[in-house]
A protein has these predicted regions:
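Core AdoMet radical
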Residues: 1, 7-24, 36-101, 114-124, ...
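An active-site-proximal structural segment forming one wall of the substrate-binding cleft
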Residues: 2-3, 108
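Catalytic cores of extracellular degradative/oxidative enzymes
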Residues: 9, 29-30
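Short, acidic, metal-binding catalytic loop of nucleotide-sugar glycosyltransferases
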Residues: 32-37, 110
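Mature, function-bearing regions of proteins
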Residues: 98, 105-106, 110
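Catalytic cores of alpha/beta
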Residues: 123-139
């Protein structure tokens, strides 16, 4: 009920979890954007990428339609990952690292846009964070030439990014 009015002036729509790509209202929102373009809106989505590759292919199709129709300004993907391998699977209940990496590959090759990995440090991830950094370097070698630089410059824009936000204490204290 609120979407038609809010979407007129909204610049960034950030869709977060649970897992947004498992929720039917996410897809309804995408359908609405295709039918009623909002070229000023940038969509940011947080996902754990723990679903079937078929679902990621569906997302790629939707993002492609929204871009081709100028339905949105931009689409940005954010995923949480703190380390790599067995330790990552242990830290994130239900994570299948092979499925996660396949979904990332489908997204990067299909959408040809960057992805940002959000890192949350804890006692188990900080000791193996280097393995994740090594993996990021590997991905950068794989995807840097696949994903175009949309800035219109020769500037090297990282396609595989990671964010390590730092918060000493809650702001209210």
């Amino acid at each position: 009920k609120w979407w038609p009015e809010v979407s007129k002036t909204l610049n960034i729509l950030r869709i977060t979890g649970g897992e947004p790509l498992l929720h039917k209202t996410t897809w309804k929102t995408f359908d609405d954007l295709i039918e009623n373009p909002k070229p000023q809106i940038e969509i940011n989505i947080n996902t754990n990428m723990g679903y079937t590759p078929r679902r990621m292919e569906k997302l790629v199709d939707y993002v492609t339609k929204m871009r081709d129709n100028n339905s949105i300004k931009a689409f940005k993907m954010f995923s949480s990952m703190d380390t790599w391998g067995d330790r990552a699977e242990y830290l994130r209940t239900g994570l299948d690292i092979e499925t996660w990496e396949k979904n990332q590959d489908i997204y990067l090759r299909g959408v040809q846009s960057h992805i940002t990995h959000m890192v949350t440090f804890n006692i188990l991830s900080v000791t193996s964070f280097k393995s994740f950094l090594v993996k990021i370097l590997e991905w950068r070698k794989t995807y840097e030439d696949i994903i175009p630089n949309n800035l219109g410059t020769d500037e090297n824009v990282r396609k595989i990014r990671f964010d390590t936000p730092y918060l000493k204490e809650p702001i209210q204290y």
